[in-house]
């Protein structure tokens, strides 16, 4: 990704990642000095609360992390916090604070199999008899260092909680700027509902394709699962396939389907 941005955008890039999730690519680019600013968006309020807590309530978040034991009792409690329907907003304090919900999201991501929050159980199983235990990805010292590095760049990180298509339509002028680059990583076409809380259906995927068809002169890339339906949705666009390693129970290889705007030199990817 850094090569793609360096070749097509250059220095001073504002990088938009609009299905942010863990925002791994965006943070690597920012902390690696490859972009100047990142703009994150996720329609999932749980993800938004996590990032808002890390960026603006860092000490409280870290204190909660250090004080929280990593065991099944905690897992059950954090699962209940995450699943709570009475979420706080400007008119309702809810049963749990944004910080508590953001931390529950973080805890489940670090302790669940493959980091899947919504429909996966803890690493090692409910009885913690598996080869690996739920704390194997919860090294508090390492996590604290990462969080502190991210929080130190809070002024260069902008976070939103909006529908992605609406965000794009409302920010076309910003996205059209010479040093802007947009990366879209929507939910998988197949099996997306088992991985994402706000998984897209066919109409959602089609709406995204139709929107991007009118924005080919901007600088952007979309990554998808490599299935025939996506090839059909993006027929006529500039596309490529890219081999990807991923972990769901065991290491596997698959092809990622990439879609590029007309202004992007995809050969440097």
Give short role names for the model-derived ranges:
Residues 197-269:
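Long, positively charged, glycine-interspersed low-complexity recognition regions
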Residues 3, 10, 55-183, 187-193, ...:
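SAM-dependent nucleic-acid methyltransferase catalytic core
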Residues 8-73:
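Conserved S-adenosyl-L-methionine
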